């Protein structure tokens, strides 16, 4: 998951001293815990979609709304909540967010019908949004620059572990006790992680409240939306996530069906591959230095395309290798695109990053639901065609950006040609 930089001059203690070691350790562990809770809850129904579809007698695309509604809620709430964090405090907003989201998680197993489940998931997504809207800004304010880098890395690691463990846990619990029990297990995990976060996190020392200025926020957002290069990066983030979300939303349906016929637990276990994203994100820096931004995007797209083509075979081994390539390519491309947003934005970087997150999670919603609809009507080959269309479009946008960079003077957009 991308993290959101919401630092603002009015609230950052530029000369803030670093914490002593015990406090820094507590902060690191607290942010790891809340990062794990965030992604465990966010995608808790993804591995359960075949069971949910069967339980409510609905199509895959209808069941997929239990994932898409959550990411839509997050996308719509992240920008307003990042603004509220400037006024009311990062730690306070994260506490309210994780408490509310965990409380809603406890209600999910009790949902009497699909509409109720989708509504609860949308509310949960909006609650979760306060965490990525505040986490990096909190770390930037409370720790010195050197310690912040490691702390952000642990927060992202928590995201990866939570995203993987939530999916794998639900798959195995559902196989033995049903999908409602699986959601209850994730809720317990989220509550425990929320308690760990709350007990460990020290009181913020360097936060200074800023006044809410909606006009300034709107002006900053409008300015970013008028920049073609930022719009291209937002489109790339949306399309990459649409392809990735489509694959992982539907893969469970394919693996439990013939010719594979895996159990729910085994099908859910493929989400361990999600951890490949941690490695590819970590390698993005050195590869970016060698390939340049656009070269890195081409490499990411080609890797994901190769993975998609491998999944067309009837060999389980080839499908798993394909998923590894898709996952690695997606996370690499996402790391490049999201990192470029902060580099390109000359002002209001918090809002520029927030807009990227909006596009990213809208892509998750679009890809999950549209991909499931395509799969329902055209089987896996149709899903692959859908994801390929998204990736090819991403490549064309990157190609257009390359042509623009070569055609225009470097003085007009300094430092952006890769």
What are these regions (language model features)?
Residues 13-22, 202-234:
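Juxtamembrane intracellular "pre-TM" segments in multi-pass secondary transporters
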Residues 116, 145-147, 153-201:
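Helix-loop-helix hairpin linking two adjacent transmembrane segments in secondary transporters
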Residues 57, 89, 110-116, 144, ...:
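Helix-breaking motifs and short loop linkers at transmembrane-helix boundaries and internal kinks
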């Amino acid at each position: 998951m991308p993290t959101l930089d919401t630092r603002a001059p009015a609230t950052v203690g530029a000369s803030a001293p670093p914490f002593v070691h015990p406090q820094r350790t507590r902060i690191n562990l607290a942010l790891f815990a809340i990062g794990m809770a965030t992604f465990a809850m966010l995608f808790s129904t993804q591995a359960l979609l075949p069971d949910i579809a069967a339980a409510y007698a609905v199509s895959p695309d209808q069941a997929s709304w239990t994932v898409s509604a959550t990411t839509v809620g997050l996308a719509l709430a992240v920008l307003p909540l990042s603004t509220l964090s400037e006024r009311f405090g990062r730690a306070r907003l994260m506490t309210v967010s994780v408490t509310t989201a965990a409380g809603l998680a406890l209600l999910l197993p009790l949902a009497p019908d699909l509409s109720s489940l989708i509504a609860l998931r949308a509310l949960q997504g909006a609650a979760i949004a306060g965490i990525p809207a505040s986490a990096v800004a909190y770390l930037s304010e409370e720790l010195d620059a050197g310690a912040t880098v490691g702390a952000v890395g642990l927060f992202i690691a928590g995201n990866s572990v939570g995203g993987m463990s939530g999916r794998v846990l639900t798959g195995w619990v559902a196989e033995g006790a049903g999908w409602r029990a699986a959601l209850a297990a994730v809720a317990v995990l989220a509550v425990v992680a929320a308690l760990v976060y709350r007990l460990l996190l020290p009181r913020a020392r360097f936060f200074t409240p800023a006044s809410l200025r909606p006009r300034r926020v709107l002006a900053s957002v409008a300015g970013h939306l008028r920049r073609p290069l930022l719009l291209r990066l937002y489109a790339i983030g949306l399309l990459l996530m649409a392809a990735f979300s489509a694959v992982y939303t539907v893969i469970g349906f394919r693996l439990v069906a013939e010719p594979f016929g895996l159990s729910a637990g085994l099908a859910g276990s493929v989400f361990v591959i999600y951890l490949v994203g941690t490695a590819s994100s970590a390698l993005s820096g050195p590869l970016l230095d060698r390939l340049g931004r656009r070269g890195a995007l081409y490499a990411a797209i080609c890797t994901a395309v190769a993975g998609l083509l491998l999944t067309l075979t009837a060999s389980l081994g080839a499908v798993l290798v394909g998923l590894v390539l898709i996952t690695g390519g997606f996370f690499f491309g996402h790391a490049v695109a999201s990192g470029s947003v902060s580099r390109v934005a000359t002002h209001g970087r918090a809002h520029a990053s927030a807009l990227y997150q909006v596009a990213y999670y809208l892509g998750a919603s679009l890809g999950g639901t549209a991909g499931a609809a395509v799969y329902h009507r055209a089987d896996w080959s149709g899903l692959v065609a859908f994801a390929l269309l998204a990736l090819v479009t991403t490549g064309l946008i990157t190609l257009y950006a390359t042509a623009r960079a070569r055609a225009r003077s470097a003085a007009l957009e300094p430092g952006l040609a890769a």
